[in-house]
Regions:
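Adenosine-nucleotide cofactor-binding segment
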Residues: 25-28, 40-117
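Glycine-rich phosphate-binding loop and adjacent beta-alpha segment
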Residues: 113-176, 213-215
Length: 215
């Protein structure tokens, strides 16, 4: 479990979240769920999570996500506006010429889906001046319109793997019980069940992470 959580730790580090930032996690597969776990460990929130899978939404809630939505029914960005609104100008996020008086805390969006079209959806939906951390690994050609990012002055950051130090830190957090990982483990199988377990990973309702226990 150290490896996916280290990936998440690196993504959160790349997000450089401040005390007032409100994170939005798009996609609650293994990496998105791990990002939620790291955010909760660090006391960052409220955490908004979005996924179309009921099973994954349930896992996100179990890991501590404060608001969990089905994006087909409720926009996570609408949820952000509800919880990020503030009256103190000192807590406002970054302002721009086009968006000079947005009375909201800053937003950091974690794209943890990794399929074509999602970056464009995030750029179109994310609040102005968001930081978008792309942690989902899209293996196909993708396209998005830079105009959305330019007009909103969105910071687009890509994240991959982790450093040696981050891996060691993640392992230490797990050993100390500071990082919640148990809900991520949805199945435990022996070596003779690995093939069937791998086939089942294509079903988002079945498993998040499968732990292989050698006999």
């Amino acid at each position: 479990m150290t490896e996916p959580l280290a990936v998440a730790l690196h993504a959160v580090n790349r997000g450089a979240l401040g005390d007032d930032d409100v994170p939005i996690v798009i996609g609650c597969g293994p990496i998105g769920l791990a990002v939620i776990s790291v955010l909760k460990m660090r006391g960052i929130g409220p955490v908004i999570a979005a996924d179309s899978s009921p099973a994954r939404r349930a896992l996100a809630a179990e890991l501590g996500a404060d608001i969990v939505v089905d994006p087909r029914e409720t926009s996570p960005y609408d949820s952000w506006r509800e919880v990020a609104a503030v009256s103190d100008p000192a807590r406002f996020g970054r302002q721009t010429a086009l968006f000079p008086t947005l009375p909201f805390r800053p937003s950091v969006v974690f794209e943890c889906v990794g399929v074509p079209g999602v970056i464009q959806q995030v750029l179109a939906g994310a609040p102005a001046c968001s930081r978008v951390i792309v942690a989902g690994l899209c293996m196909a050609e993708d396209r998005f319109l830079p105009t959305f990012g330019v007009l909103k002055e969105i910071d687009l950051v890509f994240s991959l793997y982790y450093t040696v130090e981050e891996f060691a830190r993640t392992l230490a957090h797990l050993a100390a019980g500071e990082l919640v990982a148990e809900p991520l483990i949805t199945s435990r199988v022996g070596l003779d069940e690995v093939v069937d377990a791998c086939r089942g990973l294509s079903d988002p309702e079945k498993d998040a992470k499968v732990l292989i226990i050698p006999a």
